């Protein structure tokens, strides 16, 4: 798909991190950008920054786990600009779950699924029919993760399960768009190949009351800085991928019509091969990993 001025891109989770980097990159291509996020103050700041740089911007406070909120976002985008050409279902959270799976609070799962899975589905339902009906080339990018999207991560099982669901959902979306003969493409994004400095580690700041934890955490929430310090203390250097690099990967992938937005990585390739071989061999999953601090 060719990206050009006059087109409109919608990005959820756009107030910071990967989402804001994608919005900046689309704006640099001359696209109008619609920013959606649950954090109102950060959203206003992001929109003001882009507008000051000359971008055409619409910002809306949105809870992607609420279908009506996402439908209202679509209505606002189409009312303001008449069409949407790129949709990035990017909003995501960590669950805050502790301990073994059978010890998790149901609300940890409900909240993570509300944002990471239902949020993507709500975006698809709200925008894709209109994008198809418009007849112009378009593209949908759904953000997954190597943690779950490539192979399970048992020590972050809730998050990993949601990101695995995003991969399968996007594969199904791709097939449905092809069967429809639509001019709209689909991709699944695996940000990386290294760690990213985003607000994911502090997701609990946005946890809604309806999904509140039923009991206090046994340990405090850990920050990315604390994780990095613990890794260094254990003798492991943590590598980071700039969010701008992820945004560039997205733009390149849209232009190429690439389904798997998966950056080159020997580690990812090993995980893909190991998991596939385990299935072919009907063998136990010896490839499962754990992270320090989990």
State where each predicted segment sits.
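Active-site loop of short-chain dehydrogenase/reductase
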Residues: 6-7, 56, 83-84, 131-145, ...
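Canonical Rossmann dinucleotide-binding motif of NAD(H)/NADP(H)-dependent dehydrogenases/reductases
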Residues: 2-34
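Catalytic loop of short-chain dehydrogenase/reductase
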Residues: 141-165, 171, 175-179, 192-195, ...
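SDR active-site lid
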Residues: 179-261
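The beta1-alpha1 cofactor-binding region of Rossmann-like NAD(H)/NADP(H)-dependent oxidoreductases
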Residues: 40-41, 61-72, 106, 143
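Substrate-binding pocket helix/loop in short-chain dehydrogenase/reductase
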Residues: 98-101, 105-110
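Conserved glycine-rich Rossmann-like NAD(P)H-binding loop of the short-chain dehydrogenase/reductase
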Residues: 29-46
């Amino acid at each position: 798909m060719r990206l050009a001025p006059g087109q409109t891109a919608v990005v959820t989770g756009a107030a910071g991190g990967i989402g804001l980097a994608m919005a900046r990159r689309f704006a640099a291509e001359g696209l109008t950008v619609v920013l959606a996020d649950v954090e109102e103050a950060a959203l206003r700041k992001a929109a003001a920054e882009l507008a000051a740089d000359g971008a055409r911007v619409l910002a809306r406070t949105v809870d992607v786990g609420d279908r009506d909120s996402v439908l209202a976002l679509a209505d606002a985008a189409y009312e303001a600009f008449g069409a949407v050409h790129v949709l990035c279902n990017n909003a995501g959270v960590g669950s805050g779950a502790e301990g073994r799976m059978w010890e998790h609070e149901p609300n940890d799962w409900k909240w993570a699924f509300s944002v990471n899975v239902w949020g993507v589905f709500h975006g698809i339902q709200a925008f894709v029919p209109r994008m198809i009906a418009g007849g112009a080339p378009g593209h949908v990018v759904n953000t997954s993760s190597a943690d779950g999207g490539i192979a399970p991560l048992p020590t972050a099982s809730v998050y990993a399960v949601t990101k695995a669901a995003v991969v399968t959902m996007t594969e199904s979306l791709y097939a449905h768009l092809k069967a429809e003969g639509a001019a709209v493409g689909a991709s699944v994004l695996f940000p990386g190949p290294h760690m990213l400095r985003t607000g994911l580690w502090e997701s609990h700041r946005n946890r809604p009351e309806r999904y509140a934890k039923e009991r206090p955490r046994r340990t405090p929430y850990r920050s990315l800085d604390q994780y990095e310090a613990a890794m260094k203390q254990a003798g492991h250097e943590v590598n980071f991928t700039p969010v701008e690099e992820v945004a560039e990967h997205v733009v390149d992938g849209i232009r190429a019509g690439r389904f798997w937005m998966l950056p080159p990585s020997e580690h990812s390739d090993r995980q893909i091969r190991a998991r596939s071989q385990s299935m072919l061999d009907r063998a136990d999953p010896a490839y499962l990993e754990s992270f320090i601090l989990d």
